[in-house]
UniProtKB/Swiss-Prot annotation:
The modification Phosphoserine is found at residue 716. The keyword Phosphoprotein applies. The gene is DGR2. Pfam families: WD40 (PF00400). Present with 504 molecules/cell in log phase SD medium. Keywords: Phosphoprotein, Repeat, WD repeat. PANTHER family: WD REPEAT DOMAIN 44, WD REPEAT-CONTAINING PROTEIN 44. Belongs to the WD repeat DGR2 family. This is 2-deoxy-glucose resistant protein 2. Residues 1-60, 723-748 are annotated as: Disordered. WD repeats lie at residues 171-210, 278-316, 318-358, 426-471, 476-515, 651-689. SMART domains: WD40. The keyword NADP does not apply. Disruption phenotype: Increases cellular tolerance to 2-deoxy-glucose.
Length: 852
């Protein structure tokens, strides 16, 4: 299990409970860490500062510690993974008829790990402590560390023959500069400061997941053998050849496969898929094409073309200076666009290996992006804070502005260089990241600009005006890139930070125009702080009194409606002439070093992961499937039910086809020490409670069954008790007829499973059955019934975790003579019935001899 070394908070802790703690610690430790961890060239105390921050993290972070380990589970036996899987699947095929609507594909993983270990984890989960400032995003609730990947120190470039790196760079030779996923979601590429390029593959099949478990087990065994040999050699040298048994015993963490822990919810294979070593210096950018090719930009003045299935680069594009950006043309990946420090943006033809078009922007190019969806426009960011918009075809100039100079913003004049028009040259801030997205509200292109002055801004490229400003994170010399993503239909912007934290904001300007168009002009009542605009519009749309307003809004040809909407636009522009300052972020302490990159797994990567029997996906999808079945059944009987039982709680959707919602958020962060951390959202609290309840039923059932089997005198004792209970029930039900058959059931909770090949002794009354739930999560639709019989042999029966009695069947035409119950189950080959099928009462256990 994972637990923070300094935090013992539960998953449902709210920021209000730690308000005083957080108010005392959020500013001071961050300001202090920022002065420590700025990447100052030539600062030889950098390494010691990191060590000091690690030692003092638990003292100053107020419980927001990054000293965490990935969540792990323990397997239950010593047989290999494949054998255990085959045995479990075989047993499921045998007992599958004993389950009512329980998915056979979602039961096998309960046999793969220690249920007690997993139950302890479910009862006491310890999630990442997240700081929420004024508002939170449910997509990042219940976050835990799922996996850690490390860039090894052994990789060194063999092609670079230039001058050695400075001492400060050697401390961060494994620093990760870029991280991105392929379009098919199969690979994640990592570009490092030492020029190495690493490809990690997403787990996409159950077989590969099992192979991953076996490889981890073999590594553990080899480490145990190595430790045994070392102790053997040490004992020979210290004891003159005398060896004791304790000397050959490995440590407790390598005692064998039964003690081996495995990751709870890994995303990538533990071993890197491929490593490319052709770049000599820092890899600054990497981009995937729609056909699976990869282009990288490096400080060695080259851009290289790769493919995951090839061991070497396919082509090299030489530049006169550092290549800071490289990107594929979306509609045709035979062309790439690169940005260089020689002020020129180039469009290359890969087949011809030559420059087709070029544009000189008179400034150092530090970032580059294309407009969605077809890359019609090319947007360039420069060292001094200028933005250039070009037509991709021919790289023709369209417009430009400066991110902080308001005199260049919101103008209709599109000068070639803003400084030539206004007579001054701006110096900074440096643009470190760009991302363009299309606004479906006003049909305009919007640009996310990240600068090294710790700001992320959103610009409307049509008006060249800032719409929103995100603040809170810390940026120095790192190439932080604020990224926009729609998560559960909510616009989110996220980034890493030099203060070791991860930050994310909910975009407030995304639906700005939609709010202006949808707001009723005659409503003068102001919005309350507890009611959002979406919620107010939803209430208004549901009321019949607003039909006239809705009609006017939908009729675009009406002059009256157009006049009102124009007034709203003018009023909103007057109020919102300045950019929205958004500091309502949520964050958590992700690393003990500056966080260089942050990326959220795309939908295609999550879908690939769901194909590998991912535990979180299997449990969540099974839960919503059964909850949906219960709702559909209840809806048939009660059509006017106001509330839907399956809600989108914690960011998960009840739609079974929505695989992404069932898996949850997968966040990847990297730092300057070469560490890759994978964070995930855990299963819902409702799912945890259901699994814990089912585990308790399993444990009680098997404990009671095992105790009765091991007792040699148990059969005779039970026979006497059953005889006494049978006579008591005869007297009771003969005098007072029961009004409810459910209330007449005996109080016995559990019973043993009757094997199919075990004969039933004549004259032995059947014991009442146990009431089990229909499946892991939903409520019971009936009782699981089994016969309590005595076998002629004295051999004991071993119960598996899924050896549950069969489901009872209701026969309305039959009636019990003892309890007047109508629930019966079929007992095949009953000797009392002459070898034919017989029936027993599910309520009192009486054998029915009359079948008329």
């Amino acid at each position: 299990m994972f637990k923070s070394k300094t935090s013992t908070l539960s998953y449902d802790e709210t920021p209000n409970s730690n308000e005083g703690d957080r108010n005392a610690t959020p500013v001071n430790p961050k300001e202090k860490s920022q002065t420590k961890h700025l990447n100052i060239p030539g600062d030889r105390s950098r390494h010691s500062s990191i060590a000091d921050s690690k030692r003092s993290s638990s003292r100053y972070d107020g419980g927001y510690s990054a000293d965490i380990i990935p969540a792990q589970l323990r397997f239950i036996d010593n047989i290999d993974y494949g054998t255990r899987l085959r045995k479990t699947l075989h047993r499921n095929s045998v007992v599958s008829n004993g389950y009512n609507k329980l998915s056979e594909n979602d039961r096998w993983y309960f046999d793969l790990f220690d249920r007690k270990y997993f139950e302890n984890y479910l009862e006491e989960p310890t999630y990442i402590k997240i700081f929420k400032k004024k508002e939170g995003l449910e997509q990042f609730d219940r976050m835990f560390l799922a996996q850690e990947l490390k860039i090894p120190d052994v990789y060194k470039s063999t092609t670079y023959q230039g001058e050695p790196a400075v001492a400060n760079s050697e401390l961060f030779k494994n620093s990760i500069c870029c991280c991105t996923f392929s379009h098919d979601g199969k690979y994640m590429v990592i570009g490092c400061k030492d020029g190495s390029l690493h490809l990690w593959k997403v787990i996409n099949s159950p077989v590969k997941r099992s192979e991953m478990g076996r490889s981890e087990k073999s590594v553990s065994a080899s480490r145990a053998n190595s430790l045994k040999i070392q102790r053997h050699l040490a004992s020979i040298s210290s004891h003159n050849g005398s060896i004791s048994s304790n000397d050959l015993k490995p440590s407790d963490q390598f005692e064998g496969p039964s003690k081996q822990l495995h990751l709870y919810a890994p995303v990538f294979y533990s071993d890197v898929f491929r490593v490319f070593m052709e770049h000599a210096l820092d890899i600054l950018d990497a981009n995937w094409s729609k056909n699976g090719f990869l282009i990288t930009a490096s400080m060695d003045k080259t851009a290289k073309l790769w493919h995951p299935e090839r061991k070497y680069s396919l082509k090299t594009f030489v530049h006169p200076d550092f290549v800071t950006s490289a990107i594929f043309f979306p509609n045709d990946d035979r062309f790439i666009i690169t940005g260089c420090l020689d002020h020129r943006c180039r469009l290359w033809s890969i087949l011809d290996n030559e420059v087709s078009y070029a544009f000189d922007c008179k400034d150092l190019i530090t970032s580059l992006t294309l407009s969605p969806p077809g890359g019609e426009y090319t947007i360039i960011g420069t060292f001094n804070g200028y933005i250039y918009v070009l037509l991709t075809h021919g790289l023709k100039f369209v417009s430009s502005f400066h991110v902080s100079d308001k005199s260049t913003q919101g103008t209709t004049k599109n000068s070639f260089h803003p400084s030539s028009e206004y007579g001054k040259v701006q110096h900074g801030p440096r643009i470190t990241g760009l991302q363009c997205f299309f606004s479906k509200v006003d049909k305009n292109l919007r640009l996310i600009v990240t600068t090294n002055d710790s700001k992320i801004q959103i610009f409307d490229l049509n008006e060249k005006k800032p719409l929103e400003l995100f603040k809170g994170f810390q940026s120095g010399s790192s190439r932080h890139r604020g990224q926009f993503l729609m998560m559960k239909n909510e616009p989110v912007v996220f980034t890493g930070s030099d203060d070791h934290w991860f930050y994310t904001w909910k975009m407030q300007s995304f639906n700005l125009s939609a709010e202006m168009n949808c707001t009723a002009p005659h409503r003068k009542k102001r919005l309350s702080g507890s009611m959002s605009l979406k919620g107010l519009l939803r209430i208004v749309s549901n009321k019949s009194t607003n039909d006239e307003c809705l009609t006017e809004t939908s009729n675009q040809s009406s002059s009256h409606t157009f006049t009102n909407s124009s007034k709203n636009v003018l009023q909103t522009q007057t109020v919102g002439s300045q950019a929205i300052k958004n500091n309502h972020y949520i964050s958590f302490h992700a690393h003990n070093s500056p966080v260089t990159c942050a990326s959220i797994a795309p939908d295609v990567a999550i879908k690939n992961l769901s194909l590998s029997n991912d535990l979180i996906f299997e449990l969540t999808s099974q839960y919503f499937k059964e909850m949906g079945q219960n709702y559909s059944e209840s809806k048939e009987t009660c059509d006017n039910k106001p509330n839907h039982p399956v809600t989108e709680t914690g960011g998960f959707s009840s739609n079974l086809s929505n695989v992404v919602n069932n898996v949850g958020t997968i966040l990847i962060t990297t730092d300057s020490q070469g560490l890759i951390r994978v964070f995930r959202t855990d299963i819902l609290p409702e799912i945890r409670k259901k699994i814990i309840e089912k585990f308790h039923e399993y444990n009680l059932f098997h404990l009671e069954a095992a105790g009765k089997i091991n007792n040699h005198n148990n059969d005779s004792i039970l026979e006497n008790r059953m005889d006494e209970r049978s006579s008591t029930e005869d007297n009771e039900f003969s005098t007072t007829p029961p009004s409810n058959t459910h209330n007449s059931r005996p109080s016995h909770d559990f019973c043993e499973l009757h094997p199919n090949n075990s004969p039933v002794i004549s004259g032995m009354p059947s014991r009442a059955s146990a009431i089990f739930k229909n499946s892991i999560f939903n409520k019971s639709n009936g009782s699981f019934i089994s016969l309590k019989s005595r076998s002629e042999s004295t051999s004991s029966t071993v119960f598996g975790p899924h050896d549950i009695p069969r489901v009872s069947t209701t026969y309305p035409k039959l009636k019990c003579d003892v309890c007047n119950g109508s629930n019966f189950e079929c007992a095949s080959k009953n000797p009392i019935a002459g070898g034919d099928s017989g029936f027993t009462c599910a309520d009192c256990g009486t054998i029915l001899n009359n079948f008329r």
